[in-house]
Amino acid sequence: MDKSELVQKAKLSEQAERYDDMAASMKAVTELGAELSNEERNLLSVAYKNVVGARRSSWRVISSIEQKTEGNDKRQQMAREYREKVETELQDICKDVLDLLDRFLVPNATPPESKVFYLKMKGDYYRYLSEVASGDSKQETVANSQQAYQEAFEISKSEMQPTHPIRLGLALNFSVFYYEILNSPDKACSLAKSAFDEAIAELDTLNEESYKDSTLIMQLLRDNLTLWTSETQGEEADNVEGDN
């Protein structure tokens, strides 16, 4: 199958909501070695976000059930074994994506926005790994995630408008990383607030093409800020991860 056929198959898979097939097609496109177009980049991102998202959601549900079965050894063992199965799937998906990023996507990225997009993706998938890791493995995945986010953040600050949806999406996910993974609410709030304020100050630079994406992410930043501020003030609330 040539590149255009693989891309067509990925689009078909997306319409059928068969995201594993979509990811397989876009992985094959990436392994051809050429730099991806914006459309191809987005197809790859959507495919893997759905594939890993389903496992993250399952993992959370099963972990919660596992905790509730304390005192019932047989049920707890069944829940634990099932959680470990989902965990292995999740880890394999993340390692697949990180391998594509390290071998093809980051080295081949020429425009700054592509570099930021892929480094953000690298931060995201190490973050997903860290959610299910423990001990030394957790420390390593957390450090790798932070390093990728930080590198992307520095490029985005110097090369992109504050209203650019990729820069805003990075700020959103990096702030979630500080809040959820590093347990640093002050740093999370500070990062989210700066990104929001800087974008508001330059709203006139928004082009029609990205207006919808940018304003949606700004809304998510504001929602998280409201939530995190109320939580740090001692109010009970569930964290809606506005994860881009």
UniProtKB/Swiss-Prot annotation:
User: In its UniProt record, which GO terms are filed under biological process?
Assistant: protein localization; signal transduction
Q: Name one GO cellular component term.
A: cytoplasm
**PROSITE patterns with a match to the protein in the record:** 1433_1, 1433_2
The domain of life for this entry's organism is Eukaryota
Site note Interaction with phosphoserine on interacting protein applies to 56, 127
Pfam families registered for this protein in UniProt:
14-3-3 (PF00244)
Subcellular locations according to the entry: Cytoplasm
The UniProt keywords, alphabetically, are:
Acetylation, Cytoplasm
The cross-references to InterPro entries, in alphabetical order and at most eight, read: 14-3-3, 14-3-3_CS, 14-3-3_dom_sf, 14-3-3_domain
Please give the residue positions where the record annotates the modification N-acetylmethionine: 1
Q: What CDD domains does this protein map onto? A: 14-3-3_beta_zeta
Q: What does this protein do?
A: Adapter protein implicated in the regulation of a large spectrum of both general and specialized signaling pathways. Binds to a large number of partners, usually by recognition of a phosphoserine or phosphothreonine motif. Binding generally results in the modulation of the activity of the binding partner.
| The protein's assembly and partners | Homodimer, and heterodimer with other family members.
Question: What PANTHER family does this protein map onto?
Answer: 14-3-3 PROTEIN
Family, per entry:
Belongs to the 14-3-3 family.
What protein name is recorded for this chain? 14-3-3 protein beta/alpha-B
Q: Origin organism of this chain? A: Xenopus laevis (African clawed frog)
What taxonomic classification does the UniProt entry list for its organism?
Eukaryota, Metazoa, Chordata, Craniata, Vertebrata
Question: Gene behind this chain?
Answer: ywhab-b
